[in-house]
Amino acid sequence: MARIAGVNVPNHQHTVIGLTAIYGIGRPRSQKICDTAGVPTTKKVKDLDDNELEKLRDEIAKFIVEGDLRRELSMNIKRLMDLGCYRGMRHRKGLPCRGQRTRTNARTRKGPRKAAQSLKK
């Protein structure tokens, strides 16, 4: 397996598909990376030589991927929470931030249903 940006890229896949195993690289970006590096997109990862792998590594180094991208996203959310803005409050409460209804639905964000509490006298 080729190791690019700290990720083991699957050998049996085409280069374009294999690069999507890296967090922060999707199909369009992997296509652009292959084009600028001059690597054929239909070539399997196991068939790439060291020179082509090095070109891919250099191109990917120009983007924010993997741990740096995850850290940046979490810092953005933390910044919103520290500001105390509406989106930050919704993140803190674990509710949808983009205006979706929450009276019904929103189960993904809210988690599984809690049992109804009975009133005690």
Swiss-Prot record:
One of its GO terms (biological process) is translation. GO terms for molecular function: rRNA binding; structural constituent of ribosome; tRNA binding. It comes from the Bacteria. Keywords: Ribonucleoprotein, Ribosomal protein, RNA-binding, rRNA-binding, tRNA-binding. GO terms for cellular component: cytosol; small ribosomal subunit. Residues 92-121 are annotated as: Disordered. The keyword Metal-binding does not apply. Gene3D superfamilies: 1.10.8.50, 30s ribosomal protein s13, domain 2. The keyword Cell inner membrane does not apply. It holds the Pfam family Ribosomal_S13. Located at the top of the head of the 30S subunit, it contacts several helices of the 16S rRNA. In the 70S ribosome it contacts the 23S rRNA (bridge B1a) and protein L5 of the 50S subunit (bridge B1b), connecting the 2 subunits; these bridges are implicated in subunit movement. Contacts the tRNAs in the A and P-sites. Part of the 30S ribosomal subunit. Forms a loose heterodimer with protein S19. Forms two bridges to the 50S subunit in the 70S ribosome. HAMAP family: Ribosomal_uS13. Belongs to the universal ribosomal protein uS13 family. This is Small ribosomal subunit protein uS13. It comes from Janthinobacterium sp. (strain Marseille). The gene is rpsM.
